[in-house]
């Protein structure tokens, strides 16, 4: 939400909210918390329709998901928010990308298996993703060492 607000307020960006039908309520909630006139809920019947819309994005901010890999395959510039997975194993491939991660000593702790994701931390559960800050993502996009193709 905070990243969306900052992109809209400071860069006049349009924010597209992707996800499956099970995430429609979440996408609507996010859209309402940022500026609805600058955010768009992507609801498609077919995965290929979502991909066609993704191709129009200037940059794709995502977690480690199928859409991250699709964005990479499309040659999009990708900002990947990585928490419990291994960024050396799952990173966007053959495209310009930045990895935003806390690089905690307990990560990676998720190794693609049928077991559900659990967190062994006692201080903050899933700290690796919950404590990623907007400025970390913003700086990877716009500041020194960020992408020269986004202004």
Enumerate the language-model features and the residues they cover:
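Donor-binding and catalytic core of enzymes assembling or modifying cell-surface/extracellular glycoconjugates
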Residues: 1-83
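Intrinsically disordered, low-complexity, compositionally biased regions/tails
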Residues: 8, 24, 143, 149-150
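Nucleotide-sugar donor-binding patch of glycosyltransferase catalytic domains
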Residues: 33, 40-41, 72-149
